[in-house]
UniProtKB/Swiss-Prot annotation:
This is DNA repair protein RecO. Involved in DNA repair and RecF pathway recombination. InterPro entries: ARFGAP/RecO, DNA_rep/recomb_RecO_N, NA-bd_OB-fold, RecO, RecO_C. It comes from Shigella flexneri. Belongs to the RecO family. One of its GO terms (cellular component) is bacterial nucleoid. PANTHER family: DNA REPAIR PROTEIN RECO. Transmembrane segments: none annotated. NCBIfam families: reco (TIGR00613). The gene is recO.
Length: 242
């Protein structure tokens, strides 16, 4: 654990007069809680680097739940997120902080996270496809495997012209009932391919990931979503979060 690890800061808060408490996501150790001693002092060279969306190399150690940051280096400047992409980045940071246990390795998820924020930084349109792909990847790494290609129970291949109802922990079954848990075969095929060519498939992906993530998030609302509603134009909020 004392070696260098690639990492990103998910969240930070003041800890004593001169230190920071960090929630970080690392390549080898997963989510880790760190104390950065002296990081808030005027002479500290760390404060500017220990920011969300800055690719970092960290070295830390300690025996308790809270580790001590030994060294930190910024690999590059922070990825340029602003406006809706900034709130989207804060959302995925909060999502990881809420659903990942401490010190559980998720190396592949680390690169899914990196790819997501890189996509957000280079996005000139909607961030929704990148967010949906990341949510689906996260669910997969958490062990929430869903078969989008075959009907639960019968095992029949999903038909693009039929409708299917989602049942938690089971999958999708053919259904003639249309409600919030119903998806078309076309939508399921888009979810499986992680490709969302139109607004219909994006809305379906959001419906599914919200349902699937709900057990992990519980009843506590996401702070990033509330911040988005407060500070972004109402039309944008409706488009991206409703």
């Amino acid at each position: 654990m004392e070696g260098w690890q690639r990492a990103f800061v998910l969240h930070s808060r003041p800890w004593s007069e001169t230190s920071l408490m960090l929630d970080v996501f690392t390549e080898e150790s997963g989510r880790v809680r760190l104390v950065a001693k002296g990081a808030r002092s005027k002479r500290s060279t760390l404060k500017g680097a220990l920011q969300p969306f800055t690719p970092l190399l960290l070295r830390f150690g300690g025996r308790g739940e809270v580790k001590t940051l030994r060294s930190a280096e910024a690999v590059s400047l922070a990825l340029p997120l602003s406006g809706i992409t900034l709130y989207s980045g804060l959302y995925i940071n909060e999502l990881l902080s809420r659903v990942l246990e401490y010190e559980t390795r998720f190396s592949e998820l680390f690169f899914d996270y990196l790819h997501c924020i890189q996509s957000l930084a280079g996005d000139t349109g909607t961030p929704e496809p990148a967010l949906r792909r990341f949510e689906l990847a996260l669910l997969g790494h958490l062990g929430y495997g869903v078969n989008f290609t075959h009907c639960a129970g019968s095992g029949e291949p999903v038909d693009g012209t039929m409708t299917y109802r989602y049942r938690e922990e089971k999958g999708f079954i053919a259904s003639v009932v249309i409600d919030n848990k119903t998806f078309t075969g076309r939508q399921l095929k888009a979810l499986n391919a992680r490709e969302f060519p139109d607004a219909d498939t994006l809305r379906a992906a959001k419906r599914f990931t919200r349902m699937a993530l709900k057990p992990y998030l519980g009843g506590k609302p996401l702070k990033s979503r509330e911040l988005f509603r407060q500070f972004m134009p109402k039309r944008t909020v409706k488009t991206h979060y409703e």
